[in-house]
């Protein structure tokens, strides 16, 4: 009834008075009134005056219960067919400026997803209402009777609306009946931990007072108000309305909802006609921007309708002359909307309702403002609640001590957020600060909406300074120098218009607790601008900074820095270790080490080792050894030797030998040796040897050796060795070794070793080693070892040795040798020898030797070595020293591989020395 009165009033005001004067007949009045009543509904002015009524008197809606999940819900799309053609319209992308990401429409259809509150009306009269729902969210469809329109002109108009973080949608004509489909949205804010005690019910969360006062300026909006036209809201057909959001909205985490609309425009619409979108008072369309605008609806590059926001926060769109020339115009619209902090002041459930005419959509969401940050007795939280990009200003509201704890000597500082390119200007000229005291913490709104009239202004009682660039400092000068109630600090600042950075601020509260411990607590706020629009309140989070080292210390302004951390480490370790190991290894290692080691080791070990090792070793060795050796050895050797030797030897030897040798040897040797040796030796040997050897050796050796050795050795060795060794060794060795070693070794060794060794070893090793070692070792070792070893070794060695040997030998040899030797020797020897030998030899030899020797050796040796005073027929106890110096072509020390020929070569060496000495003596006599 009221609508009819309004319609008559509108007709009488605009049309009927003029018609009665001109026509003056009742027939004309009757004909005109029936048509004008349908086309001339409320004007914009009337719509504005009745907006509150339409908000409360819209057709019934179904409120969706809150969900337990956060599934996003998208706007709906409605499709219908027309007789001859259709025109679809979507809103323009870049016209709406807000502080949060908004959505865009896409030209795709997708299957429905859960949780959208959507209402759709069809262009078919008397179509029954249906409800589409998922989980606990409900959708409502309300029938709306409309007139079908026909057209012979087919126009398709499309444009893309680009508020961010959304999915574009376009209405598609399909069938006569209207189908509603949902598109998924990616717009849900990521939730953070919330305090369940802060969740209030709807009547606590929503301020029901009216009228609403918006945070944005409507002056510019009013200036853009269109010329009054006809309100055709109820003549729109195929109307769809949707509220797209998760079940929880976090306003202080840039959370927002999307309002989605779709409709068809009647062909009778003309330029100046309007329609209204009702927006719930719990939402606003500006976020934190000071002025709100709504996007125009675009048809390609042409404006279909322009929108403004009225004083109640609703949206009025006015059609342009585009509709005068087009039929079957369809449009879709998406607007981001934000929780209004003035009307929703606390955390709790809120029911949102929006619509076009009698078509509405409802959805209940949980608004979660989250709690302040707290660290011991310090609590703080801030938010950026207003930005004016026109004047380059911002407003930040900070709650200091919202928990109401006791804070002694409190100090608040504000500065740019570290490690960001913040565009804020903080100084005395660009920053204004107000401080308010709150007597009761319950008076603080969780939405950070502040009415200054409700609190005491104490700005003049505090000390505000700007101690550093881009930093302010607020000292709360209370009589007892402590605070026990909350304070509100409102900062009005400026933004650098020339900066490309975002607005990022840090607020830090310092203070003592009751135990007089100085601590600090910080809160960060950010706002990012994207595509010319503000992106909301930003991601707010508490920060616990590094605590001050000194009481009263204020955090300095951080500066950008690049750091290249470096570390120095030193380690001092003493280790005592014992191990049983069997290894098959292939290693390629490069090492440069300098070590200074002083170790004293007393070891008593019984070892039974069965090891299979395959070794391929490439080693480059440069060795400087200083060795002092005193060796007393008893040896009993039984040798049976079968030797086949093919030797090509080029030797340049300068030997000065003084040998005193006392040897008692019983040797039984059975040796099968196949040796291929090519030896190039440049040897300067000065040897001083005092050897007393008693050796009992039983050796069965099968050795296949291919040796290429490159060794540069400077060895100074002082060794005192007392060795009693009983060795039973069965060794099969296959070794391929390429050794390059650079070693400088100074060794002073005093070794007393009693070793009973039974070794069975199978060793296959492939090793490539590049070692540069500088080793200074002082070792005192007392070792009692019982070792059972079975060794199978395959050795391929490439050795280049440069040896300088100084040897002084005093040898007393008593030898009984019975030798049966079968020797096949092919020797090519080029020898240049300068030898000065003084020998006192007492030799009694009984040797029984059967030797079959096949030797093929290639050795390049350049040795500069002072060898230890080792016995000629050493036992297994000296294997450790021999292994270290095995690459040096030194005299045979009685190892397992050479024990079988020691007696023969000792006898030959004695005879050769006597002959050489006699020849020199004869040469001297001739001279």
UniProtKB/Swiss-Prot annotation:
Location(s), subcellular: Secreted, Cell wall
This protein's GO CC annotations: extracellular region
Signal peptide per UniProt: 1-39
Compositionally biased tracts (Low complexity): 47-65, 106-132, 143-162, 566-598, 856-867
UniProt keyword Transmembrane helix present: no
Residue positions of motif LPXTG sorting signal: 890-894
One example GO MF annotation: fibronectin binding
Biased composition (Basic and acidic residues): 881-890
Residues found modified as Pentaglycyl murein peptidoglycan amidated threonine: 893
Pfam family, one: Big_8
Acidic residues composition-biased segments: 547-565, 599-855
Entry function: Cell surface-associated protein implicated in virulence. Promotes bacterial attachment exclusively to the gamma-chain of human fibrinogen. Induces formation of bacterial clumps, which diminish the ability of group IIA phospholipase A2 to cause bacterial phospholipid hydrolysis and killing. Significantly decreases macrophage phagocytosis possibly thanks to the clumps, clumped bacteria being too large to be phagocytosed. Dominant factor responsible for human platelet aggregation, which may be an important mechanism for initiating infective endocarditis.
Family from the record: Belongs to the serine-aspartate repeat-containing protein (SDr) family.
Name of the molecule in the record: Clumping factor A
Species per Swiss-Prot/TrEMBL record: Staphylococcus aureus (strain NCTC 8325 / PS 47)
Gene that specifies this protein: clfA
